[in-house]
């Protein structure tokens, strides 16, 4: 199994905790799925903690500290603040997989908007009251497919 690692030269805007977490993850040879199971979170949410895009709870910090053998105080100091979200990727993204996700929004964004507006009315899908998951699906011919589910609370625009 190949593991996600971090090259800090390619991600200079990530918080200092990211490098610490990724080094420990590599040393322990753990996947995000394994770490997520240990801390009781979704694997995408767990990866978001590593990239500084999600807030870690005190319980998350305690479990990460034990699993990754990182002193609790060092992790708590770096992970207990509020994340500075949205700064980890330059726009448009250059990394091919992240660019494909960006391209999906470019190509289908207005189609998603139209269908969502027809189904729910004038509003937005929350990225705060939100969950996501990634699954692997294999078809009858043996082709692998990525299935990404986005689940956000619908927030109607207020009339004022």
UniProtKB/Swiss-Prot annotation:
Catalyzes the reaction of cyanate with bicarbonate to produce ammonia and carbon dioxide. This is Cyanate hydratase. GO terms for molecular function: cyanate hydratase activity; DNA binding. The keyword Lyase applies. It catalyses: cyanate + hydrogencarbonate + 3 H(+) = NH4(+) + 2 CO2. HAMAP family: Cyanate_hydrat. It comes from Aspergillus niger (strain ATCC MYA-4892 / CBS 513.88 / FGSC A1513). It comes from the Eukaryota. The active site is at 100, 103, 126. GO terms for biological process: cyanate metabolic process. It holds the Pfam family Cyanate_lyase. Transmembrane segments: none annotated. Gene3D superfamilies: Cyanate lyase, C-terminal domain (3.30.1160.10), lambda repressor-like DNA-binding domains (1.10.260.40). Its EC number is 4.2.1.104. Signal peptide: none annotated. InterPro entries: Cyanase (IPR008076), Cyanate_lyase_C (IPR003712), Cyanate_lyase_C_sf (IPR036581), Lambda_DNA-bd_dom_sf (IPR010982). CDD domains: Cyanase_C. Belongs to the cyanase family. Keywords: Lyase.
């Amino acid at each position: 199994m190949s593991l996600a690692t971090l090259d800090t030269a390619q991600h200079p805007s990530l918080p200092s905790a990211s490098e610490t977490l990724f080094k420990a993850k590599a040393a322990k040879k753990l996947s995000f799925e394994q770490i997520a199971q240990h801390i009781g979170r979704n694997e995408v949410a767990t990866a978001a903690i590593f990239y500084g895009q999600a807030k870690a709870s005190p319980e998350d910090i305690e479990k990460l500290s034990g699993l990754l053998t990182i002193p609790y105080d060092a992790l708590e100091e770096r992970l207990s603040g509020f994340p500075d979200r949205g700064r980890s990727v330059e726009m448009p993204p250059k990394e091919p997989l992240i660019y494909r996700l960006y391209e999906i929004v470019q190509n289908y964004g207005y189609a998603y908007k139209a269908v969502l507006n027809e189904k729910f009315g004038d509003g937005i899908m929350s990225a705060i009251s939100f969950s996501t998951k990634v699954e692997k699906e294999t078809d009858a011919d043996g082709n692998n497919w990525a299935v990404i589910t986005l689940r956000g609370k619908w927030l109607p625009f207020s009339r004022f």
